[in-house]
Amino acid sequence: MFKIMKDFTEQEKIIVLDFGSQYNQLITRRIREFGVYSELHPHTITVEEMKALNPTGIIFSGGPNSVYDEDAFRADERIFDMGIPILGICYGMQLMTTHFGGKVERAKDREYGKADIHVEKPNRLFAGLPTDQVVWMSHGDLVVEEPAGFEVTVTSKSCPIAGIADEERSLYGVQFHPEVRHSVYGNELLKNFALNVCGCKGDWTMENFSEVEIAKIQEIVGDKKVLLALSGGVDSSVVGVLIHKAIGDQLTCIFVDHGLLRKGEADQVMETLQGEFNMNIIKVDAKKRFMDKLAGVSDPEQKRKIIGNEFIYVFDDEANKLDGVEFLAQGTLYTDIIESGTATAQTIKSHHNVGGLPEDMQFKLIEPLNTLFKDEVRALGTELGMPDAIVWRQPFPGPGLGIRVLGEITEEKLEIVRDSDYILREEIKNAGLEREIWQYFTALPNIRSVGVMGDGRTYDHTVVVRAVTSIDGMTADWARIPWDVLEKISVRIVNEVDHVNRVVYDITSKPPATVEWE
């Protein structure tokens, strides 16, 4: 399988080096909020590879290692000599310190949580910010001696050297995590680094992104044909419109009705994308094929792999009926790739767009959105002229309801999730909350409980309502839905959906949980 990669060498950008922190993806997202393109790369990148990327600035992320661990993550030390601004965060600051001859030691007690800092010596990084701030700390080591040529810029009660700077060489380090929202002025600090220190213009927009992508798709595809893995969700729909704008009828959308879609979704997909956008769509009824393969399967990873494989096999079947097809398009997002793991971060769960793909797949893979976060995809959809009904559609995973039915999938369980999810979406819309809640859906855990309905005892299914608020999907908080709305949802589900006698509301944030249950 051959993946088409992007080339943003001409775009001003800040490169984030991944040293394994659970927060490092947030750094990339925050930088983009300032109109500056940013990418995450493994810490193993060489100085030659870094120069080829032509970055405007570099950020060293945090990480779980001690700089003195034998197997600690290191960077190519020549990167420090490139003569461009570098910001080291937490572990990144400690790496910078040891590289330039400073001293790092184990802290007596690991510091984790909110902390008060004092800016001793304001500089370009702290321009316009208060001298006293609340930040988020997460470290087991600390700097006890700054390197020659650096000044101590920030202190805290438990961390006397919480920030260092060499203004002349534009080298900065902070022990805290500005990318985490608990750091009250963290966004402003990162903005100062991007705009003040690195001198970025902040002119990266979805308009120029779409222009670059359309031109790149045209260049890569030429006169060949593309198949799109169309699910009807936001991501694949935006991919479809983007590619259709680039190559028109050279795009054929394969819409697989695998029997794992939401209520009425198959018809809506055909009416909207084929009717309004005049896209070439082949609908494949593969319900029985998928259900046969999933029979008796309970493990979530196995379900994902089966669904991913069957999708590709269906595309292979359809592609064999077409001439000149060389490319397969997918709606893979940056968060999908992140959650599936990088060289330095543990896999959380394999994602449907990056896991389960056969190695001998016959297509070249195009993923135009694989550098974008969800909110950026919505902004791109709006830029492309797509209606709000599509752009603001609830996120829906490629495996569909297959990962919202926990355990073995049956037709009865699918109907329960379809009907309960439809009720949830109706009531959220009736309450005017559809734009306030980032994602909401129902899931069916493999749980039955005792209940009383009418004059009889029941032993039926429990439905979970999941609703979260988020900006980019990297972190999420459970949505504070008004009690009266939750009551309506619960009453309707129990009364209108067969074989359900209990509704529970999931109030777990991400992390520690993921948004989906599987």
Curated annotation (Swiss-Prot):
The active site is at 90 (nucleophile), 177, 179. Pathway: Purine metabolism; GMP biosynthesis; GMP from XMP (L-Gln route): step 1/1. It is an enzyme of class 6 (ligase). Residues 13-203 form the Glutamine amidotransferase type-1 domain. GO terms for biological process: GMP biosynthetic process. GO terms for molecular function: ATP binding; GMP synthase activity. It holds the Pfam family GATase. Its EC number is 6.3.5.2. InterPro entries: Class_I_gatase-like, GATASE, GMP_synth_C, GMP_synth_GATase, GMP_synthase, GMPS_ATP_PPase_dom, NAD/GMP_synthase, Rossmann-like_a/b/a_fold. It catalyses: XMP + L-glutamine + ATP + H2O = GMP + L-glutamate + AMP + diphosphate + 2 H(+). Keywords: ATP-binding, Glutamine amidotransferase, GMP biosynthesis, Ligase, Nucleotide-binding, Purine biosynthesis. Residues 204-393 form the GMPS ATP-PPase domain. The keyword Transmembrane helix does not apply. ATP binds at residues 231-237. GO terms for cellular component: cytosol. Catalyzes the synthesis of GMP from XMP. Homodimer. HAMAP family: GMP_synthase. This is GMP synthase [glutamine-hydrolyzing]. It comes from Listeria monocytogenes serovar 1/2a (strain ATCC BAA-679 / EGD-e).
